[in-house]
């Protein structure tokens, strides 16, 4: 039985926090469309679309009355958040984020998992390049904490129901409450 009152939900957090996993699970449980912003952003061979193109793609999907959006693209936050009813913020400790990123990267490299079409992760760049997801997580972790704390306290987002989880245990307890 679905007693969850919100039908437009944004799941946010740093890379490796579990946004896609949780958003996909929420969408399945609530029987809502799942929108993975990375899938809108990345083209073949890791070609990024322009901000304008991302905005057009995102605008098309969030026009609907119900969705679960996964992602942190600040260039479209002005589209997604005003339409959202709830934000789920996965604000987990940095060591856990890095551990999850490590496991996810190895799994994707070893299985050659396709991401957003034909893209696959390659070991060396993920660990040792300036485009490393690990480096990105380290660079953005504290900035994201400050950004979300600030954004979620702004009057224009006062109508959002915020679920702020600081550990996977908190998130799992919320999911077990039976509202979903």
Locate predicted features:
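Active-site signature of alpha/beta-hydrolase-fold catalytic machinery across serine-
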Residues: 25
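Conserved lysine of the Walker
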Residues: 19
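The conserved Walker
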Residues: 15
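Hydrophobic positions on the alpha1 helix immediately C-terminal to the Walker A/P-loop
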Residues: 22
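NTP-dependent small-molecule kinase module
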Residues: 2-6, 29, 135-180
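Hydrophobic anchor at the beta1->P-loop junction of P-loop NTPases
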Residues: 11
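A glycine- and Lys/Arg-enriched "phosphate-lid" helix/loop adjacent to the NTP-binding pocket
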Residues: 92-144
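Conserved nucleotide-sensing/catalytic segment adjacent to the nucleotide-binding pocket
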Residues: 33-87, 92
């Amino acid at each position: 039985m679905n007693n969850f009152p919100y039908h437009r939900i944004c799941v946010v957090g740093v890379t490796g926090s579990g946004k896609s996993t949780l958003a996909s699970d929420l969408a399945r449980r609530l029987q809502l469309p799942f929108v993975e912003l990375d899938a809108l952003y990345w083209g073949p061979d890791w070609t990024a679309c322009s901000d304008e193109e991302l905005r057009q793609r995102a605008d098309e999907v969030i026009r609907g009355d119900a969705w679960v959006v996964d992602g942190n693209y600040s260039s479209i936050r002005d589209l997604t958040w005003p339409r959202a009813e709830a934000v789920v913020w996965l604000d987990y400790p940095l060591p856990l984020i890095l551990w999850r990123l490590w496991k996810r990267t190895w799994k994707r490299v070893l299985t050659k998992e396709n991401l957003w079409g034909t893209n696959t992760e390659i070991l060396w760049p993920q660990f040792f390049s300036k485009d490393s997801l690990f480096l990105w997580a380290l660079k953005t972790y504290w900035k994201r904490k400050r950004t979300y704390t600030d954004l979620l306290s702004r009057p224009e987002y006062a109508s959002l129901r915020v679920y702020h989880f600081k550990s996977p245990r908190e998130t799992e307890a919320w999911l077990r409450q039976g509202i979903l």
